Amino acid sequence: YDIHERLVGSEMCIRDSVKSEELRWYLGIFLTVTAAITMVILPQYGTVGNALRYASFQVASIMSTTGYATADFSLWPVAARMLIFMLMFIGACAGSTAGGMKICRIAMLWKQGVRSVRHTFQPRKVQVVRFEGKGVDDTLLRETASFAFVYIAMILIGAVLIAFEGKYDIETNLSAALTCVSNVGPGFNAVGPAGNFAGYGSFAKVVLSLLMLAGRLELYPMLALLYPALWRKQ
């Protein structure tokens, strides 16, 4: 919303908004994935215009976690489905009402990964992770990595729990857990754009509901309810 506020204004404000590193990451991911999916699904839709239209709408919907779909991407080639699957983790920018891990966390995790690889070859060199022009302290990087670990662990645990019903394959269960934690909307196959979650039993629906709440609250508030030490008065 901060970026939206700066975009509504003079030409100088628009130029300032473009300087936002998070916005550049967001647009970069959107354009790159849209172009890649367009090429993958081009044989399926015949013309570049049609392929681009379907690809851009689905990518925008997934990244903004709006939940709309104009095509059943469960029927797209594997490469396109893999890209959609990865987008479900990402979400939109920090401060937005969208779900997902958020662009800022993805960017910092990427930069931390690059720094770790470089440190392997240059152990004596001091390397600082920078985001939005400022150095990011190691405490924040550890917290970001911890959030990512909990995020992925919750998805995997949720997928395993709902798999005990034995109704759907691994792709359906994993995408169902992921789309609930990220609050995306549709998943793949039976829970894809042409389907819904009605086929799951009561137990799975409770698990998926808890995953949705956890994702909407950014995980930790829900986990705090399971941590008895926080219940006591200090």
Predicted regions, residues:
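Extended C-terminal subregions enriched in glycine
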Residues: 147-164
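Membrane-helix cytosolic exit motif
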Residues: 94-95, 103-106, 215-232
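Juxtamembrane inter-helical linkers in multi-pass membrane proteins
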Residues: 15-18, 22-25, 58-63, 106-137, ...
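Membrane-helix interfacial "entry" motifs
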Residues: 18, 22, 46-47, 77, ...
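Alpha-helical transmembrane segments and their helix-start/interface "positive-inside/aromatic belt" motifs
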Residues: 16-31, 143-152
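P-loop potassium selectivity filter motif centered on the GYG triad
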Residues: 6, 33-98, 164-215
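Single conserved hydrophobic/aromatic residue that forms the stacking wall/gate
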Residues: 1-14
